[in-house]
């Protein structure tokens, strides 16, 4: 309720005027930013700044122990460092070794306990000189993130601090060789680029996904997510006395007991445990979508005894030893029996807790999982990084499994230790087994969700609000160039050399997945004013890897959240236009060390301001990777739009009998009306089956019968169960809708000319089977015509601007030459009306009365197509039919940069979508220009996020900011896909499902060729 009141207050202040004013750093913050940069430069060498190096070497931490909140820990740790009884420098740090975890935790607590900034700086310099590099990096970063006097300081990207952990060891070796040649005067080049192709040894399937799994931006993101699990609020770190049993129970367990007693704060239900599960579900869903885009099936189940996943990372630690890898067939039974049994035991205990509904605390208290805090409890148990209610019994499943599956060799001496990538938070996402492991973790999460009551019609309905249509501009992915500074591995560079830039600069050149910025438009009718409505947008698969339609309710774990925002709805018609770059929970590219340094230096010299970057603007998921890689002919997905009230959610928590165990007898299952269900909720409980189990209830709304016949998302609730003919993949034939064989029609989104067969999407008007057959015949004729045209075509550049017609569903057949199309907004009179043809010149004859495009000019003399007419006033249409991949694209899309066209239609201004031009391509990428982009250095004007997003994160601990999880109204993360959805829930008018295609433009892989 407290959060609801705050939300209403923000709405009253005008959430529709969302821009956040940038704040410039003062001199104090600039100095601190300078200190952090210098302490993290060339971390395996002495500090380049001689003043800091001398400070660290001369500081006597023991004699200054009174300057810390816990002097006993200072004396204990400093004595161990002086005696050489801590991890030495030059060896690789990993959380898998208990002693190393202890040392880094003590250092973190010391840094956090420094009473003032100067003491903190001296301690950091001392640790930088005397402590292991990996331990220092983790403790120092965590302390800067947590301390109040270092807020708004940002770090260099982890792949520039430790490039050895992210780039192939051969690239690192080449950079070091270049540095040696420079010192010998054999190389006078000032700027040297080393092309990087991801060369980890992977299976064939995983190699296709290397653009995602080996992405260094993804690794940097997950490094922070992993670190956040070990960061606790500052007041919890300063315990000077051991906790009594009563204090322990109150601090760790008490908040959950209060929830059971009815003291509920909806926003407080979203803690680290819930975020841990949600962020990993989202990461896994993105990986699954990219698998699907590449024609691969679901993630394979992991076997703790026999691991089938080839991986040789070709990465190395500071000691020069390469990280451990795995052969294709790894037998662990003979060498890791004890660890295998331990991991299996932890998993069984978690499954038992989910099935029984209760977690046992060290005091013998049974704590229910089926309560508002249940998600937090379960997530904390699985992660096991200090928040678990019973760490002795439940351990840390994810940490133990990483150690097992990583296959690092057992050693007795730290100098010989080489951890696996899986054990290092900053590179774990590079290992394919990471995703197999987290599929098992997500299976636990889904097992828990299946025992929660499903969302019903009453739970999701927003009375009087109807989403009439959703238009999405073109979704196009591409590979863009990126450069990584390798200064950390290219020898010592003095501060004077840094300032004068006298040494040559060695950088790695990579290609990374990105996408063009896009917009979407939501047409909403509301019968009354609805202040502070929350709009959530998800993206998920339309078909499985075999081409069969999926059920959203049964596959909600495969959907990713693209956007969330507050919208005031007024009575009548509402048109919402949203820019992809405004989305919260996503971050632009991380600024490089040199960019940060230049910004600080310029601000110190008063040349230009150094703007403060908020944590949520830099620690969220990479915006570049928010869309899965598209396909030349279009990758079919679903856009799911949900509008909900900002009122608190009132739903039961069960547990209910899972579907696989339900007999549907009357004592277990009942169908009730909307009114009956509302009465049951108002009474505070659903009927009990017995033993604390709630009865399974399904609501029958009045519109369900029609929805089962007309709404494809509702029809697909049963997925492929009632489909007579199975579809094929990838996208070469239309999937027969659920219920095929009845006297029915279905919608067709577009007919595209495809190199290997035609593809029919679904959207727009209802077409009969006969019409579809006619369309397919036309498609074959057009393919023959296009083949002749292609013989004389030449390559051209694309620019972009979207031209939209009426608000009703778009209609028409599409024949495209690239991820762009012209589409008629007129009502179809026949199969061929609205045919979109791009780049075909006059003289093409054969197909008649295809109204939709006029004045399109290109290659002459092709016989077979005639009378293509329609869109007028579009100067500058690209000449010639090019790259005829045959994508059918919904929306009236015209390539970026074209002039305004069809009179009477609605045009989306090109200025609403900002981006960065990719050199030599004429295309625009969005990763660098996402809202909150650092310093506005990439383009002007800078897109900014809504004010309410900053308000949301303002008072949260940093561990709950990192990762980008957000719920503006306090509902569960991922709502309403945090639970299964009933048929009635899918039929509410404030939920809309839109079919979309994601295209890929440019080179098909991220390889760099010379």
UniProtKB/Swiss-Prot annotation:
Stimuli inducing this protein: In 5th instar larvae induced by juvenile hormone. Post-transcriptionally repressed by miRNA-34 and miRNA-210 but not miRNA-317. Induced by a protein rich diet or repressed by a diet lacking protein.
Description of how the protein assembles with itself and partners: Probable homohexamer.
Organism of provenance: Apis mellifera
Domain Hemocyanin N-terminal: 30-151
Entry superkingdom: Eukaryota
Domain Hemocyanin C-terminal: 455-648
Name of this protein: Hexamerin 110
Glycosylation sites: 197
